[in-house]
């Protein structure tokens, strides 16, 4: 079956976050994707103001019902979910995932549990329990950042071993593939650490295949949408390399780093009076990195 993704997350008119990233990246990897926009805003919320609306659970259900009524749901091979801002909407998303899995038991669910960053939540706190107890146990892949891992597991991560303990909790919830997408350790102040783990299907003594990737030097600037973009790149490369999570991460992370670097280098053309929230990822200008990816950062086994 030809890969086809249903992506349920946010959309902005200007800039690149959520589905605006995912659709671009997946299509440039040659993958069909249908977006459902859980939120539709004028721009991301780092700007001084924004306008728009959230999709209600009923309207989300209606959109999916329209796809079902026209027999368009049986061809989905993957579901990608990202930002959702209410328990009710998240429950509706989960119903959609379960419905699709009932139609296609081989369907892969990729969950980016968007909760927060930099030690803070930017969604209602009750979403944490819904993700932990209901959503994540149904996922085949999860791509949380450090803040999200700490809220979901209760483990404060200061080193590799802490990260692996948290990952073990996710595996016990039923998730086969886990990638913590950004870790910051005092021992590596100039790098971002990525740690991944997949349950080993082979009959040997190694229960998990685990690895880490050092990414650096890190950029001091903050760009919105990087996590959303990385999730879509990880999904895209997992379709190409379904049995090699470390290679998937090497490819996706290298692409993302090159895109951020392209964006960073373009700042000199931005007026000095502009605040950093105006710096949007230069996806169109960086499409060559998606289409012709070279590995920039190699993984090491843990």
Curated annotation (Swiss-Prot):
Pathway: Cofactor metabolism; pyridoxal 5'-phosphate salvage; pyridoxal 5'-phosphate from pyridoxal: step 1/1
Cofactor(s) essential for the protein: a divalent metal cation
UniProtKB keywords: ATP-binding, Cytoplasm, Kinase, Metal-binding, Nucleotide-binding, Transferase
This protein's GO CC annotations: cytosol
Pfam families in UniProt: Phos_pyr_kin
Enzyme Commission number(s): 2.7.1.35
Function: Required for synthesis of pyridoxal-5-phosphate from vitamin B6.
PANTHER family found in the cross-reference section: PYRIDOXAL KINASE
Family statement drawn from the similarity comment of this UniProt entry: Belongs to the pyridoxine kinase family.
Protein name: Pyridoxal kinase
Protein encoded by which gene: pykA
């Amino acid at each position: 079956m030809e890969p086809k993704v249903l992506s349920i997350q946010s959309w902005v008119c200007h800039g690149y976050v959520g589905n605006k990233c995912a659709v671009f990246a997946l299509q440039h990897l040659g993958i069909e994707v249908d977006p459902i926009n859980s939120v539709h805003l004028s721009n991301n919320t780092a700007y001084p103001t924004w306008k728009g609306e959230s999709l209600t659970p009923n309207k989300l259900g209606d959109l999916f019902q329209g796809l079902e009524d026209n027999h368009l749901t049986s061809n989905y091979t993957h579901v990608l979910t990202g930002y959702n801002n209410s328990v009710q909407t998240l429950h509706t998303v989960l119903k959609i995932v379960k419905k699709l899995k009932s139609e296609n038991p081989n369907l892969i669910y990729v969950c980016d549990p968007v909760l927060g960053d930099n030690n803070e939540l930017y969604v209602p706190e009750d979403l944490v329990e819904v993700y932990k107890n209901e959503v994540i146990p149904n996922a085949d892949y999860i791509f949380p950042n450090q803040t999200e891992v700490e809220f979901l597991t209760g483990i404060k991560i200061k080193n590799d071993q802490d990260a692996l303990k948290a990952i073990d909790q996710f595996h016990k919830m039923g998730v086969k593939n886990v990638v913590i997408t950004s870790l910051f350790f005092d021992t590596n102040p100039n790098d971002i650490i990525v740690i991944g783990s997949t349950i080993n299907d082979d009959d040997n003594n190694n229960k998990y295949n685990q690895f880490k990737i050092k990414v650096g030097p890190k950029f001091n600037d903050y760009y919105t949408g990087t996590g959303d973009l990385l999730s879509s790149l990880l999904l895209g490369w997992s379709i190409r390399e379904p049995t090699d999570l470390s290679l998937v991460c090497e490819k996706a992370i290298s692409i993302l780093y090159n895109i951020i670097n392209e964006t960073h280098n373009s700042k000199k053309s931005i007026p000095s009076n502009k605040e950093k929230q105006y710096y949007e990822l230069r996806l169109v200008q960086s499409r060559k990195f998606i289409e012709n990816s070279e590995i920039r950062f190699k993984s090491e086994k843990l």
